[in-house]
A protein has these predicted regions:
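Active-site HxH/HxHxD metal-binding segment of metal-dependent hydrolases
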Residues: 21, 34, 41-116, 196-200, ...
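Metallo-beta-lactamase
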Residues: 127-206
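Short, glycine/acidic-enriched loop or turn micro-motifs at the edges of active sites
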Residues: 41, 65, 88, 124, ...
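Active-site-proximal loop/helix segment associated with metal-binding centers of metalloenzymes
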Residues: 5-27, 93-99, 149-150, 198-206
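Conserved beta-strand hairpin/beta-sheet module of binuclear metal-dependent hydrolase folds
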Residues: 2-53, 131-143
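Pocket-forming structural segment of enzyme catalytic cores
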Residues: 107-109, 115-131
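Short, flexible loop segments at the rims of nucleotide/cofactor-binding pockets, characterized by
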Residues: 11-17, 34-37, 58-61, 118-121, ...
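Active-site neighborhood of phospho(di)ester-bond hydrolases with catalytic His/Asp-centered motifs
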Residues: 36-38, 56-63, 82-86, 121-124, ...
Length: 206
């Protein structure tokens, strides 16, 4: 499976605040089309990156506005479904009102050219956070659950530090250590590099 990354820039809004942010958007491609992961900020940029390839669907790792607010527009543009874990429904409604989405479930699988994309529910940064595992490519799209240097932020509403640590210990860090981690923001890392720092995360509290 071909994994493409590009960066978009815009605003993250939550709890009455607003911050500048750069987001990693991913396109998972094959002969059978593409899936768009977390399209953000700039619809024209996303459409240009996709080009004339058929879109199979849009998969969201969570429903903070910087990851999800383009999804209804792009879903309509391409005539495809938007997939989101329902535990993030309240956050989704803050950005997108009653726009429809298809609920994701833990261990759900998508397929592209015979290769699997497996969804793991990893709450903590938000209640409905998920990561996407591509075992054939030894890659994890971690959204905002895990970054190079630490877990996703848990200082805002609907987030919980103890829960994200549990998700890392019980789900993410059970994957092979050489699994490449492609996060929602910033640079890549590996499962092993971050698992080795779990005690540091816990000690510092973020």
């Amino acid at each position: 499976m071909k994994i493409e990354k590009f960066v978009t820039s815009g605003k993250f809004r939550l709890d009455g605040g607003e911050w500048d942010v750069d987001n990693n958007v991913y396109i998972l491609g094959g002969k059978g089309g593409v899936y768009i992961i977390d399209p953000s900020h700039n619809a024209e940029q996303v459409i240009n990156e996709v080009g004339d390839r058929p879109v199979r669907g849009i998969i969201l790792t969570h429903a903070h506005n910087d990851h999800c607010e383009l999804a209804p527009q792009l879903g309509e543009h391409y005539g495809v479904e938007v997939h989101l874990h329902p535990e993030d429904d309240e956050l989704w409604k803050e950005s997108n009102g009653d726009a429809p989405y298809v609920p994701l479930t833990d261990n759900q699988q998508f397929e592209l050219d015979g290769e699997k994309i497996t969804v793991f529910h990893t709450p903590g940064h938000s209640p409905g956070c998920v990561v996407l595992h591509l075992p054939q490519d030894n890659v994890l799209l971690s959204g905002d659950t895990l970054f190079n240097g630490g877990p996703g932020a848990t200082g805002r509403k609907y987030s919980d530090f103890d829960v994200i640590i549990e998700s890392l210990r019980n789900v993410v860090f059970n994957l092979p250590g050489n699994t490449k981690v492609y996060p929602g923001h910033g640079d890549e890392t590996t499962v092993g590099a971050e698992a080795a720092r779990i005690d540091e995360y816990v000690a510092r509290g973020y």
